[in-house]
Amino acid sequence: MTVLEITLAVILTLLGLAILAILLTRWARCKQSEMYISRYSSEQSARLLDYEDGRGSRHAYSTQSDTSYDNRERSKRDYTPSTNSLVSMASKFSLGQTELILLLMCFILALSRSSIGSIKCLQTTEEPPSRTAGAMMQFTAPIPGATGPIKLSQKTIVQTPGPIVQYPGSNAGPPSAPRGPPMAPIIISQRTARIPQVHTMDSSGKITLTPVVILTGYMDEELAKKSCSKIQILKCGGTARSQNSREENKEALKNDIIFTNSVESLKSAHIKEPEREGKGTDLEKDKIGMEVKVDSDAGIPKRQETQLKISEMSIPQGQGAQIKKSVSDVPRGQESQVKKSESGVPKGQEAQVTKSGLVVLKGQEAQVEKSEMGVPRRQESQVKKSQSGVSKGQEAQVKKRESVVLKGQEAQVEKSELKVPKGQEGQVEKTEADVPKEQEVQEKKSEAGVLKGPESQVKNTEVSVPETLESQVKKSESGVLKGQEAQEKKESFEDKGNNDKEKERDAEKDPNKKEKGDKNTKGDKGKDKVKGKRESEINGEKSKGSKRAKANTGRKYNKKVEE
């Protein structure tokens, strides 16, 4: 079809050029004839003038000029009708030629149109119409959200004439794997008439869609009878209804046709939209997960706050094992005391409590066990308060520890004054100020060997209890402010210095007492110790009631905090 149209266009252009050439030649010939006529008339006028000049040379100049002028006017009068007649003839001829040329052009165009129509008619008669004209293609593709695969069968009529080729698709279920390259591309054109789509559902849940696509200017055999008027309207330019139907059909094809034959197959917008929806759902899930995490993160500080409130009166998890180990080294009688003391300790002093729990050395375990049976209850209450008497505010801790420290130092000073005779003042100063624990233990054991029976048990309690008290007091003092420690040490050294000065003065006054003291040191030591211990037991029995009441109040407070 395109070749015939091109040849007709070329022929028409050649005819037009030929007509233009003819017109140009005619116009040139007319011009030449006009020039020839004008030249001939000019020559005749010149001859007449020459003749008149020769004949009337005798006359005067003025008369000659007048006659010559008259002759010229006559010649002009004779020439003008001839020239006017020639111009009129040429114009008439040219007008007739143009009219003929226009008529020829119209005739040629009519012939070309008739030839094109005859060629189209021949082509339509040569190709008999059939229902299977064009390519029949069926695709099965799973659509998300449907119960089963949807079968899409499409019927297209291709412009170029050729053999009918059918590509049967897989009718049973979706394809398990891509079968080679994709099929030939489908040429989908706009629909020329509204044809309702046929939706059929099989027993297996498959939906078959059979849209029919018809190209503009062509029709099927069955539809030709029904839609002749519609097709004529579409050929003339179409109506608003047909345009709306085309747009609707385009959208329907985009949403219905799905190509999933292979990895390289085409995908329509209908698949992309569910993917976007899936991405949106994933994003929503991520947002929900983030919100849950944020809620859990928000819940963590609340839990931490509750843990902090509880841990102010309890022990964190990290040091549970250490505290259990430290409790395992402590005898059974003191386990409950240690646990209660640890429950009342705030965070800042947990390490101090663990150190105070680990005070008991391996070598002194037996002594501590012995001391449990013989320690007076006053000293046990002091130990309990030194360990479990730590409250939230450090002021109460400082006050109680100062009271414990002062009581312990007073008891030690009293014992040292009762134990040490005048002859051993230098040794007592060393033992009280900077004597190591080993020497104290040796001295106390040597002193303990003097007495017998129940006095030996009391001495063993004294041997073990002062060590534990001293170590616990020292490590509990580490939690107290450094300024208070320095003040307490200064006070203890001042007291010791005053006692030493008094003893030196007594020694200077009575030098004979030194010798007596050297002889009777051993006996005096035992007697003084027994007296001091009895006095301390009496004082302890007096203060039992008050300290037991205080300990009971502290235990009740710790139980409330643990709850």
From Swiss-Prot:
Q: Where is this region: Disordered?
A: 56-81, 311-563
Q: Where is the composition biased (Basic and acidic residues)?
A: 69-79, 367-383, 412-447, 485-544
Tell me which GO cellular component terms the UniProt record holds: membrane; nucleus
Q: Which regions span the lipid bilayer?
A: 3-23, 99-119
Where is this gene product found? Membrane
Q: What is its main location?
A: membrane
What topology does the record note for this protein and the membrane?
A: Multi-pass membrane protein
Alphabetically sorted, this entry's keywords are: Membrane, Transmembrane, Transmembrane helix
Composition skew (Low complexity), residue ranges: 384-395
Q: What is this protein called?
A: Testis-expressed basic protein 1
What organism is the protein native to? Homo sapiens (Human)
The gene it comes from is: TSBP1
